[in-house]
Amino acid sequence: MRTHTVDHPLAAALLTTMRDERTPNAVFRAALCDLTGILVYEALREAPVDTYEINTPVAPATGARLAQPPLLVPVLRAGLGMVDAAAGLVPDARVGFVGIARDESTHQPVPYMESLPEDLAGVPVFVLDPMLATGGSMRHTLELLAARGATDITALCVVATPEGIATLERSGLPVRLVTAAVDEGLNENAYIVPGLGDAGDRQFGPR
């Protein structure tokens, strides 16, 4: 599995804003939106394009557009804050949804909804989730996508852990990871250290 960690001063500054426990919800959401844009930019760096002819106000020119916009799949609820930024950069993208909660006693993912196209053969997919902790939620999402024929999947995560990366590598599922940071690991409660806290709560308030 390929892992690309974004190395950019703006990404580092936005990540710092998100990490800071003093950051208000609205500022956290804005930083997540901006950082998502950077992750999408990096994820599309090698995307194939189609060329076509246009006319500028001065002369004819050859333009470019994405050959196939990705399907965006936010993992609810934390991934919801990444959708607008991703769709803003790729306005032709479709959006699917996967809902997964966390069992606080077992630290295991608890799926509760999915809304995805039935046939994803040949369709690039971007999974949006701010945090790759144990990797359980991401693995479940990847399994849903692979069962529908997806073979070109990119996970966009603000922070990841070695444990989460290992989970994806062991899964054998077709995925690459684009992240702003690989953190130290997980604590006894399976929270990322130093991490962001609960990304859903920090965007929308406690459940």
Curated annotation (Swiss-Prot):
Q: Name the residues that bind 5-phospho-alpha-D-ribose 1-diphosphate.
A: R77, R102, D129, P130, M131, L132, A133, T134, G135, G136, S137, D198
Q: Which UniProt keywords apply?
A: Allosteric enzyme, Glycosyltransferase, GTP-binding, Magnesium, Nucleotide-binding, Transferase
Keyword match Zinc: no
Q: How is its activity regulated?
A: Allosterically activated by GTP.
Which EC number applies?
2.4.2.9
Which pathway does the UniProt entry assign to this protein?
Pyrimidine metabolism; UMP biosynthesis via salvage pathway; UMP from uracil: step 1/1
Q: Which GO terms describe its molecular function?
A: GTP binding; magnesium ion binding; uracil phosphoribosyltransferase activity
Q: Where does uracil bind?
A: I192, G197, D198, A199
Give the stretches traversing the membrane.
none
Q: Which reaction does it catalyse?
A: UMP + diphosphate = 5-phospho-alpha-D-ribose 1-diphosphate + uracil
Q: Which one GO biological process term can you cite for this protein?
A: UMP salvage
SUPFAM superfamilies assigned to the protein according to its UniProt record, in alphabetical order: PRTase-like (SSF53271)
UniProt entry tagged with the keyword Aminoacyl-tRNA synthetase: no
As cofactor, the record names: Mg(2+)
Q: Gene3D superfamilies this protein is in?
A: 3.40.50.2020
Q: Which Pfam families match?
A: UPRTase (PF14681)
Question: What is written in the cofactor note of this entry?
Answer: Binds 1 Mg(2+) ion per subunit. The magnesium is bound as Mg-PRPP.
Top-level EC class: transferase
| HAMAP family found in the cross-reference section | Upp_B (MF_01218_B)
Identify its protein family.
Belongs to the UPRTase family.
Its biological function?
Answer: Catalyzes the conversion of uracil and 5-phospho-alpha-D-ribose 1-diphosphate (PRPP) to UMP and diphosphate.
Spell out the protein name for this chain. Answer: Uracil phosphoribosyltransferase
Source organism per entry reads Nocardia farcinica (strain IFM 10152)
Which gene holds the coding sequence for this protein?
A: upp
